[in-house]
Amino acid sequence: MNLKTLFGAGLLAAASLLQSAQALAASDVLVTTEWLEKNLNNPKVRIIEVSVTPGVYERGHIPGAVNFAWHRDLVDPVRRDIASQENFQTLLRKSGISADTTTVLYGDNNNWFAAWGAWVFDVYGVDNVKLLDGGRVKWEAEKRALDNRAKTPVAGNVTVKAANKQLRAFLPDVIAAAEKRSDVQLVDIRSADEYNGKVFAPQGVQELAVRAGHVPGAVNVPWGQAVAADGTFKSAEELKKVYGAVGIDGSKPVITYCRIGERS
């Protein structure tokens, strides 16, 4: 599947949370809570928290984890885009990430912003990046250790590459899909109420969409449908059914989008 995420029309470039079922099932993409607990003291493993809710990290995080504030560290608030290559490299080095580091990201809310953060790593060509399957929800439910001390790691030496634009979709791409001038399929991963225009944004969010509704031709698969009750991704067969129900089978390019980008 050729999957891209939307940038344009007021949306930030977003994380590739919708992937092929084969990719989600691969052990080189996800790590378990058991694996991470065994590797908490591994000097070649760096843990990064990217949560939606402010203050979650400070109240308690996976031991050794470094906090990335999605609205400050991973984006440029002026350009309304992902962090620049230079700023992202500085962030990673400051966080102790080197060329031989295995980086594991996790967060709250079904790993919404953690998965988006992993996508930013992917855009800049950083290798050995994993997502903790189940995120904070599963880690806490299993009563695994939490720490409230901030981590100050030794600086790393990673070098990030120029942004891979093939992983991104831009406004002309979306317009072409909406006007049926391409075979690209559009997937809106927001809630059904957002998709149907009943609300402008999720409850409690201050930053609203300019207009309610969805891009013409887009199908709706809310992000939460991709995960099980414990926060882990559903099985490959389950995901095939979820996306197959709206005509997404991986045979055509897909563009995902949401409100400002991070959920998709």
Stretches with model-predicted labels:
Residues 1-10:
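Bacterial N-terminal signal peptides that target proteins for export
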Residues 12, 19, 23-55, 136-211:
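Flexible, polar/low-complexity N-terminal or interdomain linker segments that lie immediately upstream
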Residues 26, 73-79, 104-108, 119, ...:
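Second-shell loop/turn segments in exported
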Residues 43-46, 99-102, 127, 181-185, ...:
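Loop/turn elements at helix/coil->beta-strand transitions in domains of secreted/extracellular proteins
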Residues 46-83, 89:
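N-terminal, post-signal-peptide region of Sec/Tat-exported proteins
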Residues 52-55, 71-75, 109-112, 136-138, ...:
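Solvent-exposed loop/turn segments at secondary-structure junctions
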Residues 75-102, 219-254:
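Helix-loop module immediately N-terminal to the HCX5R catalytic loop
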Residues 83-181, 198-199, 213, 259, ...:
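Thiolate-centered catalytic microenvironments shared by cysteine-dependent enzyme domains
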